[in-house]
Structures are given as C-alpha cells and as structure tokens.
Amino acid sequence: YAEEVLSYLAPKYNLYILSNGFRELQSCKMRSAGIDTYFDKIILSEDLGVMKPWPEIFHFALSATQSELRESLMIGDSWEADIVGAHGVGMHQAYYNVSGRTDFPFRPTYSMTDLKELVELL
C-alpha cells in the first residue's frame, strides 16, 4: 500500500524521510521498495549525530527542509522515536499503529492501523 499512498500524497505535499537509520541502508531499502522517487529529501540521525526522539533532530529537519512546524506532520510507526519526539517539539503526529497499541500516555494527532487511512486523514 505504501506506493499507492505515496503516489496520492506526493503531488499534494512535500515528503521527507526523517530516520535513525544509516544512509546506505535507507537508500537501498527505499530503492528496492520503489519509493525513493516520492521523497524530496532524506534526513538521517547520522547527519546530525542525534537520534529521534531528541528535539534537535526535529528542529534540524524543519530547518533543512525550510518547513514550518505548524504545517508539518510526522508519520511514523515508532511510538517513542517518531510520535513522542514530534509531540515533544509541538509537531502534529500520525501514528501508524501496527501493534494495535491502546495505552497511549497522550493522544497522537492521528492514529491509524492501515496506511491507506492517510488518504482519508489528509
């Protein structure tokens, strides 16, 4: 479903990757999945030396992409790294809840169990 959702989102939004992964591995994974062309920029923790959920990497990503915090949405499947990190800097979050987790310490902006739900949310 990822490619279907990305082909819907890419013409409407600027899409970026913010990952704790390594550049070579992330690029390879994206190319093999056929999704590398949908993203405008890849920002990795190795670029800054700080990993999500630390606020510095979110601020760095906003600056590197010339994005506004209030207009940004972190979509992620890691509660701690993606959702807690984004929440900590005041960024909207969309939690891809593959585990079916229900014990949230706070309510994310959006929560979904299927990536196709992004099309309806956005």
Kindly label every feature range from the protein language model.
Residues 3, 7, 16-122:
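Asp-based, Mg2+/Mn2+-dependent phosphohydrolase catalytic module
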Residues 11-12:
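Structured helix-beta-strand junction loops
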